[in-house]
Curated annotation (Swiss-Prot):
It comes from Rhizobium rhizogenes (strain K84 / ATCC BAA-868). GO terms for biological process: 'de novo' cotranslational protein folding; cell division; chaperone-mediated protein folding; protein transport; protein unfolding. Involved in protein export. Acts as a chaperone by maintaining the newly synthesized protein in an open conformation. Functions as a peptidyl-prolyl cis-trans isomerase. Consists of 3 domains; the N-terminus binds the ribosome, the middle domain has PPIase activity, while the C-terminus has intrinsic chaperone activity on its own. It catalyses: [protein]-peptidylproline (omega=180) = [protein]-peptidylproline (omega=0). Its EC number is 5.2.1.8. This is Trigger factor.
Length: 495
């Protein structure tokens, strides 16, 4: 077998592999000898079939199997021999000429194929002893814990029916029917709907017109759907709602005590406070983690500059761009609305994709050298977390991860990345700094976020930069969540 390098340009490689017809025939004869005693052909005793006859009957099919095995097994063997790692699955090109293919299968012509791939660049790791990061830690006061508990307590608040008029804060139970131009519309009808006046659950102007109603009242109110309302057929339209008031109920007092804790399934108010404080600490801890991670990645980005495999960049950019398109479609906006053009946005997000791939390769190399591994138990926990996100779709998700090549890598990559960050935090200089929650949650204006002034793209860019690339720089498709049930048309979905 001859292995000839025909292209070595940057990270691109092209290898020509030639296996002589004589070699292929020899392999075929070996395979025929293996099956000689096993085949049964009419007119011949077992084991007495001439090789020439076997070749006539089975030659082409065996040769086809050999070709498939060579194409499957040789590329990784060749890469290993060359000491190279391919960024993606190497592309294999063979002759498409039918006559030439027939000659190869008949062992009358050499079998040739070409491998095309991009190599993962060799990365010489640098010391991170000079990397300095500030770990912001927010203090959590009792007032904040109390405020959060009171918000939670709203779900357990009791209401008592009253005879008077509805006031702000009261809960009304109503039937309603919405119409546009006198015609009822989908999602505009409900019965026994409970609404707390002032909760701003419904579109602007709806709740305010319920102030003063009493049980038994029938009323028609007029509102205008917001211009940005998700349902295009209702956005900006004036609508009427025929309302029947069934009950008006006044809110009970909310107190943080053992009774409230009991309603929430806890043994005491102290335990409730402890849990809420822990939740707040966890939320702030996630922000702290992402900010520290961002600082590390920014400095690694400055330390490592090298060419990136374009196929990985293409895949990463495609993933980012799909999300940008989705964000714009959902917001009903265009690039022009965001003071940019598609060309400029593509350029910005292309740079982001290159950064993510480059950092992914760096983190992969750091992790490999540090002996970072992802355990089977960690993968199982990640899979369980996926299942929790898609209730009712457990079987489909399990089948997806079992049957989709690369799907498990999609679970492994973020775990691997976080473990590499954990490793780096033991190597870099970390300074803790106590800050207010406002300072912790404030956007870092120094971040080089693509489309920083663009509402929809900005959201994606911030998320992309915060999470960065998967350690291997590749993406694997994941099951999409089922769409959430549509809200009633009267409700304001501008969350």
């Amino acid at each position: 077998m001859q292995v000839i390098e025909t292209l070595a340009e940057g990270l691109k490689r092209e290898i020509k592999v030639v296996i002589s017809a004589k070699d292929m025939e020899g392999r075929m004869n070996e395979r025929l000898a293996e099956v000689k005693d096993k085949v049964r052909i009419n007119g011949f005793r077992p084991g007495k079939v001439p090789v020439s006859h076997l070749k006539k009957v089975y030659g082409k099919s065996i040769m086809a199997d050999l070709v498939n095995e060579i194409v499957r097994d040789q590329p990784p063997a060749i890469l290993t021999e060359r000491g190279e790692k391919s960024a993606t699955q190497p592309e294999v090109a063979m002759t498409e000429d039918k006559d030439e293919a027939e000659k190869i299968l008949a062992a009358e012509a050499d079998f040739e194929f070409t491998l095309s791939y991009e190599v993962i660049p060799a990365i010489e790791l640098k010391s991170v002893k000079g990397v300095k990061v500030t770990r912001e830690v927010a203090e959590i006061g009792e007032d904040e814990v109390t405020e959060q508990i009171l918000k939670i307590a709203e779900s357990a608040r009791s209401y008592e029916a009253k005879k008077g008029k509805a006031a702000d804060g009261d809960r009304v139970t109503i039937d309603y029917l919405g119409k546009v131009d006198g015609v009822a519309f989908d999602g505009g009808k409900d019965e026994d709907s409970q609404l707390v006046i002032g909760s701003n659950r419904f579109i602007p102007g709806f709740e305010e017109q319920l102030v003063g109603v009493k049980a038994g009242d029938e009323k028609t109110i007029t509102v205008t759907f917001p211009a940005e309302y998700p349902a295009k057929n209702l956005a900006g339209k004036e609508a009427t709602f025929d309302i029947t008031v069934k009950e008006v109920a006044a809110p009970g007092e909310v107190e943080i005590n053992d009774e409230l804790a009991s309603k929430l399934g806890l043994e005491s108010a102290d335990r409730l406070k402890e849990i809420v404080r822990g939740q707040i600490e966890s939320q702030y801890g996630s922000v702290t983690r992402q900010k520290v991670k961002r600082q590390i990645l920014d400095q690694l980005d400055e330390m490592y500059q090298f060419d990136t495999p374009q196929k990985l960049v293409d895949a990463e950019f495609a993933s980012i761009w799909r999300q940008i398109q989705t964000d714009l479609a959902e917001s009903g906006k265009t690039f022009e609305d965001e003071d940019t053009t598609e060309e400029k946005a593509r350029e910005e997000y292309r740079k982001l994709a290159e950064r993510r791939v480059r950092l992914g390769l760096v983190l992969s190399e750091i992790g490999e050298k540090a002996g970072v591994e992802v355990s089977e138990d960690e993968l199982q926990r990640a899979l369980y977390a996926q299942l929790q996100q898609f209730p009712g779709q457990e079987k489909e998700i399990l089948d997806f991860f079992r049957n989709t090549p690369g799907a498990s890598a999609n679970l492994r990559a973020p775990i691997f990345e976080e473990k590499v960050i954990d490793h780096l935090l033991t190597e870099v200089d970390v300074t803790d700094k106590t800050v207010s929650k406002e300072a912790l949650l404030a956007d870092d204006e120094s971040e080089d976020k693509p489309a920083a002034k663009k509402a929809a793209p900005k959201k994606k860019a911030a998320k992309a930069e915060a999470t960065e690339a998967a350690a291997e720089g590749e993406e694997a498709a994941v099951p999409k969540k089922k769409a959430a049930p549509k809200k009633k048309a009267a409700e304001d979905s501008a969350e």
